[in-house]
């Protein structure tokens, strides 16, 4: 094995230490889904904020009560963006177009976002306390695992909505569930979950008795999230547009061709 060509940006599922040790190149597909994922994050946010799924379900069941379907507007509200890389930046530009106030949390500040799109960089605690909505676009690292934990949710507004299209492990799912049930926050739109593979993977489902304690607990919590009216969960599909898939294919083939020619592009580890 000489090359692992990923059809994704993230590579946290790859044993990079093993690849370094065995001189295996790992290349990813950056940039294919910047606007695609950002648009989907907005869709999740609007869905929860304006109670779209709840409205559809109630209407379908013939039990519409307008007083139960009162939503909240995005215009003029404050959105906190955690991670202002390519996707987070695309989301910031969309939010600016909706006349939202934008707080950003990232160790690298982009002058373009500050000057042209009104992004105000701040610390994590301030973002938690002042945001009406939070959209997560950070990559998963060993340092930000469960960055949204019980204490984080306690600092957020009771009317806040959180959206995650990054990685499920950025949120402590049990803490999120408790925060929503206890009305510490207003709702969530999630395209990623911890242990999300247990939801649809048949091998996991039929082997529940063989799961480790943590995975079993996450599977149970995930199933409970689906029962909450103010939560929408989608199957890690934010990237999934015709245009993004075409860009993935083009980048993957280019990566393979370049490697075959003695060049490495989009390399994620140094061998």
Residue ranges and their predicted role:
Residues 1-3, 14-26, 136, 140-182:
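Beta-strand-loop-alpha-helix segment that lines the small-molecule cofactor/substrate pocket
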Residues 3-5, 25-27, 103, 122, ...:
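Structural detector of well-ordered beta-strand residues that form the stable sheet scaffold
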Residues 67-158, 174:
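Rossmann-like dinucleotide/phosphate-binding beta-alpha-beta segment
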Residues 38-57, 77, 93-100, 179, ...:
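Oxidoreductase and adenylate-handling cofactor-binding alpha/beta cores
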Residues 9, 132, 138-140, 166-167, ...:
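Short glycine-/small-residue-rich Rossmann-like dinucleotide-binding loops
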Residues 159, 166-271:
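Rossmann-like dinucleotide-binding domain for NAD(H)/NADP(H)
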Residues 1-56, 68-71, 75, 162:
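Phosphate/diphosphate ligand-binding glycine-rich loop within oxidoreductases
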